[in-house]
Amino acid sequence: MSSRSRSKTRESRALGIALTPKAARYMEKRPYAPGEHGRTKRKADSDYAVRLREKQRLRAQYGILEKQLRIAFEEARRTQGLTGENLVEILEMRLDALVLRAGFARTISQARQFVVHRHILVDGKLVDRPSFRVKPGQTIGVKARSEGTEPFQVAAAGGHVDVLPKTPAYLSVELDKLQARLERRPKRAEVPVTCEVQLVVEYYAAR
């Protein structure tokens, strides 16, 4: 296991969620936090620790920096509706998140790399910012010169289907063509992230 894989696995165990397929397999064998040995009971966390861990869970699943999450939270708070639901919906419209949901990548880290390395198109134009906000009606695709490379051939053949959640209803995908379209704004209940968003709201509200 590479040092990066070990790091993600350890982070997954600490947060109680699998951030990568490899971490998911590891956690099936060792379903307890790092440093624990499966038999000792974990001391009850404080309210602050619970909120902090939930915030860290959300941040880790999107692979973003604290500053990026804070900016998204402030936007969510200004938007009409429930702040927590708005927050997840805003994050879900990031380009790297949708590249992952479409099945073009195996992990959020790989999805981000694809965007940064200029493999991904939005409405036929190259976009190299993972944080790019995709709008309903816009299409996501792979650059023609990149389609024949091994990572995208694996994706087009459905190589990640078994390790990713089912494609959500707000996204239509033609995987064999490496094409996807954001049909509408995501709804929190449809977004496949593990997070008690109200605790995230409480965390930021207290700071």
From Swiss-Prot:
Annotated TM spans: none
Cellular component annotations (GO), alphabetically ordered: small ribosomal subunit
One Pfam match: Ribosomal_S4
Region spans: Disordered: 20-45
Residue ranges occupied by any S4 RNA-binding domain in the UniProt entry: 93-158
Biological process annotations from GO: ribosomal small subunit biogenesis; translation
Keyword Transport part of the UniProt annotation: no
Subunit architecture: Part of the 30S ribosomal subunit. Contacts protein S5. The interaction surface between S4 and S5 is involved in control of translational fidelity.
Listed HAMAP family: Ribosomal_uS4_B
NCBIfam families in the record: PRK05327.1 (NF003717), rpsD_bact (TIGR01017)
Similarity comment: Belongs to the universal ribosomal protein uS4 family.
Protein name: Small ribosomal subunit protein uS4
Protein's organism: Leifsonia xyli subsp. xyli (strain CTCB07)
